[in-house]
């Protein structure tokens, strides 16, 4: 989930399939569709021409069947086909593979390290499943998101696609713990950098001049893929996006086993702050947001739990090293403002604290809500819309009580100064024993 904090236009509905014609069209590869594709043959009892007189045997025209088209399944738009049916052998695409360099170069060919890596087949299959879901959903979303849509339409369109492709609608108790959405979809506009998703009743509409960070996660059995991108329709922001994308790729390149966090942060800051952006005749240096970090990812724990590590995006600080077997979200944030974020606006993101104290709860609403959270989300982050979707109502008092008792954490939106613009790009990387895998890498970013 995004960041870890250091200290008149027609709507394009992401949930639609292009109108009634598309809705009634038979699915590719369906029996109905295949029957239509094998047309052009005569019925034995109809339309067969006679030769000779009436006593002669009737000759029937030979059937000429068209060859059936090879209809391998492809993903729909919007994405709605469960991914396991597109990859029936559970062989999901691997991410970008990068061999270790310098003193770790031996890992690529070392037989012991290769053996350790082969022991991680289930781990890798689950991560690659989640990563391919993320790629397919985001690549459609990048085409479909347009000015004039509400933030609720955008967020829910992405979430419905994730639920469909993982095969986990999340409405039955425990279903979302097996797979699906890893944390609320962030749709963060302009000076808001992270942790914003619409609550019920939100009417905010995406405008042409907005810069929107889209941050969403997918998990399979708690293996979380966390990746984010930024959308801007006005080319005036191109340099801002380029700066942050460059910084993220620099961080990914630097990351590896035994690499110090401080060295990664210094490289990220140098790359990002070599850019500037001109807006309405004024040049702004792109600043790394110094109190936002990348982070380790644990199973069912987006920020790595109590032993989690942070990946800074500015120089100085932590001398901790990355280690073999760790999973990281490498994310960077750039801003035309101060390069520092604060809590602002209405909270929507929450998560149960993994090692929360066993506090006696006096409010029955808090007890009941904690039971719902535990059985449906565990320690995965959730938002108010997800509670609404499960049929919960009048839960705010109980939710605030859980926060006050240190059982649930609240994650308010994180914002720079109003009038500034922020951008974000993020990937999940696996530090495998013999190679580094950028698991969420795609053709888009």
Swiss-Prot record:
SUPFAM superfamilies (alphabetical): Creatinase/aminopeptidase (SSF55920), Winged helix' DNA-binding domain (SSF46785)
One annotated GO biological process: proteolysis
EC number, as in UniProt: 3.4.11.18
Alphabetized InterPro entries for the sequence: Creatinase/aminopeptidase-like (IPR036005), Met_Aminopeptidase_Type2 (IPR050247), Pept_M24 (IPR000994), Pept_M24_MAP (IPR001714), Pept_M24A_MAP2 (IPR002468), Pept_M24A_MAP2_BS (IPR018349), WH-like_DNA-bd_sf (IPR036388), WH_DNA-bd_sf (IPR036390)
Binding site for a divalent metal cation 2: 226, 295, 331, 426
UniProt cross-references to CDD domains, sorted A to Z: MetAP2
Co-factor binding details: Binds 2 divalent metal cations per subunit. Has a high-affinity and a low affinity metal-binding site. The true nature of the physiological cofactor is under debate. The enzyme is active with cobalt, zinc, manganese or divalent iron ions. Most likely, methionine aminopeptidases function as mononuclear Fe(2+)-metalloproteases under physiological conditions, and the catalytically relevant metal-binding site has been assigned to the histidine-containing high-affinity site.
Basic residues bias: start-end ranges: 57-71
Main localization, broad class: cytoplasm
Domain of life where this protein originates: Eukaryota
Cofactor(s) this protein cannot do without: Co(2+); Zn(2+); Mn(2+); Fe(2+)
Keywords: Aminopeptidase, Cytoplasm, Hydrolase, Metal-binding, Protease
Pfam families: Peptidase_M24 (PF00557)
Enzyme class: hydrolase
Subcellular locations according to the entry: Cytoplasm
Region (Disordered): 1-76
Function description: Cotranslationally removes the N-terminal methionine from nascent proteins. The N-terminal methionine is often cleaved when the second residue in the primary sequence is small and uncharged (Met-Ala-, Cys, Gly, Pro, Ser, Thr, or Val).
Name the UniProt record assigns to this protein: Methionine aminopeptidase 2
Organism of derivation: Paracoccidioides lutzii (strain ATCC MYA-826 / Pb01) (Paracoccidioides brasiliensis)
